[in-house]
Curated annotation (Swiss-Prot):
Similarity-based family: Belongs to the class-II aminoacyl-tRNA synthetase family.
SUPFAM superfamilies recorded: Class II aaRS and biotin synthetases, Nucleic acid-binding proteins
Reaction(s) catalysed (UniProt annotation): tRNA(Lys) + L-lysine + ATP = L-lysyl-tRNA(Lys) + AMP + diphosphate
Cofactor binding comment, as recorded: Binds 3 Mg(2+) ions per subunit.
Cell location: Cytoplasm
Name of the protein in its database record: Lysine--tRNA ligase
Length: 500
């Protein structure tokens, strides 16, 4: 047992003893649930913070607040609620009347206070206690440095403590909630219908990823946590719902990184009688609108950069992006799609720039990996990358002029992908062939290749109208709006490796 653990255990024992003393002397103050909190700290500060001491005394304002004690300086307490902080003052009469509870009060305890508003000599508002109630005794002490936790692992594992002591964390998750609400409101105004599709699939599909597998006892069958809602959402478009969207979790049995968490939130939507260019226009409008509404500007700081959501956003093909960010590589500068179709040429090119490749990678996979290695990190400003090869886009419509590529884009900001969209493949026979190619790829060792979904083919055979669809990674988008650089900072309870 470390010295720190011994000290903490001692403090916990002391607090337990205080709680027992409170219960013995003031039974109602054990864990009461009858305090009527009528006001919040921030509302009080906003309404009365500009008044003088004399004005407040003349107004005779009575307020009832509740929250966590964050500091105790003699008779003054700093109380924190969801909106902010305000002080409370306990005069000698109050301390005498409530001696059993007030003297045993610790940082972290949750209390309710009623009294008149006053202004201190330093110009701070405070509630002069007339009534006081201990609502919850905190048995564990908060970190000594009241302004925050220094250990990142502890912040993620004990998010409840992080939220208590770190204002930046609270603000990040408030912003997350606002971003999700803003997206939802935007979609509803555009006449999209919000829907809910299954989280457990009998056949995983809609993305190239390893699924989590579970077992349904009653049906005695394997089930998979969904990796994407795409195939179900497109079934709804077949059924006649022309504009649908869903905000929900996806699960992918893959590694952890600053950009990846096994469960993450996506907003995925589909619109009939539209193509991938319409999606790009809609994305520009959405993000520009949300940035303006939530931040008051389309220009947001991100690390050492300023990201401009104002648009128009850059648009270039994957091949052109590789050429743009490899100006000194003569082979890349002269590369054509005919050469991209040559798997040996692409393997040699990847090896020449120091990449390690998998033997089952196709021409399209090699092109995407070269793009990811050399171009993607450079895409700080909002950029649509188009021209994704068909062999890595099994659900996307082929380009009319170049059948090697599809009418697909991925959207990048801050050097990472944030969204993926395309004109949907609605040719049932082409989809059938591409599913079969995915099965062959899986047999060759690609465990992220898709499964064959016969029911989805059946749905397409009923007729999917010309449709475009897109998924937006909420977590990565929130990282941009909160100027954070790891996905764990915007997921309340991220996946963590076991301790010890």
């Amino acid at each position: 047992m470390t010295e720190q653990t011994q000290d903490e255990n001692k403090l916990i024992a002391e607090r337990r003893a205080k709680l027992e003393h409170i219960r013995a002397n003031c039974p109602a103050n054990g864990h009461p649930n009858n305090f009527d909190r009528k006001h919040k700290a921030a509302d009080i500060q906003a309404e009365y913070g500009h008044h003088t001491k004399e004005e407040l005394e003349g107004m005779d304002v009575q307020r009832s607040i509740a929250g966590r004690v964050m500091a105790k300086r003699g008779p003054f307490l700093v109380i924190q609620d969801v909106s902010g902080r305000i002080q409370a003052y306990a005069g000698k009469d109050v301390q005498k009347d409530l001696k059993a509870t007030f003297q045993g009060l610790d940082i972290g305890d949750i209390i309710g206070v009623t009294g008149k508003l006053h202004l201190s000599g330093k110009g701070d508002l405070y509630v002069n206690m007339e009534q006081y109630q201990l609502l919850t005794k905190a048995l564990r002490p908060l970190p000594e440095k009241f302004h925050g936790l220094s250990d990142q692992e502890t912040r993620y594992r004990q998010r409840y403590v992080d939220l208590i002591v770190n204002e930046e964390s609270r603000e990040a998750f408030i912003m997350r909630s606002k971003v999700v609400s803003a997206i939802r409101n935007f979609m509803i105004k555009k006449e999209f219908m919000e829907v809910e599709t299954p989280m457990m699939h009998s056949i995983p599909g809609g993305a190239s990823a390893r699924p989590f597998e579970t077992h349904h006892n009653a049906l005695d069958m394997a089930m998979y946590l969904r990796i994407a809602p795409e195939l179900y959402l497109k079934r709804l478009v077949v059924g006649g719902f022309e504009r649908v969207f869903e905000v929900n979790r996806n699960f992918r049995n893959e590694g952890l990184s600053p950009r990846h968490n096994p469960e993450f939130t996506m907003m995925e939507f589909y619109m009939a009688y539209a193509d991938y260019k319409d999606l790009m226009d809609l994305t520009e409008e959405m993000l520009s609108s949300i940035a303006t509404d939530l931040c008051g500007s389309t220009q947001l700081p991100y690390g050492e950069h300023t990201v401009d959501f104002g648009g128009p956003y850059a648009r270039l093909s994957m091949l052109d992006a590789i050429k743009k960010y490899n100006p000194e590589n003569a082979t890349i500068q002269s590369m054509t799609y005919e050469e991209v179709k040559d798997v040996e040429f692409m393997r040699n090119l990847a090896k020449s720039i120091g990449m390690t490749i998998e033997k089952f990678w196709t021409c399209g996979q090699l092109l995407e990996e070269i793009f990811g290695e050399t171009a993607e990190p450079q895409l700080m400003q909002p950029t649509f990358i188009t021209g994704y090869p068909a062999d890595i886009s099994p659900l996307a419509r082929r380009n009319d002029e170049n059948h090697f590529i599809t009418d697909r884009f991925e959207f990048f900001i801050g050097g990472r992908e944030v969204a993926n969209g395309f004109s949907e493949l609605n040719d049932a026979e082409d989809q059938d062939n591409r599913f079969k190619a995915q099965v062959d790829a899986k047999d060759a060792g690609d465990d992220e290749a898709m499964f064959y979904d016969a029911d989805y083919i059946r749905a397409l055979e009923h007729g999917l109208p010309p449709t475009a669809g897109q998924g937006i990674g909420i977590d990565r988008l929130v990282m941009l709006f909160t100027n954070t650089h790891t996905i764990r900072d915007v997921i309340l309870f991220p996946a963590m490796r076991p301790q010890g």
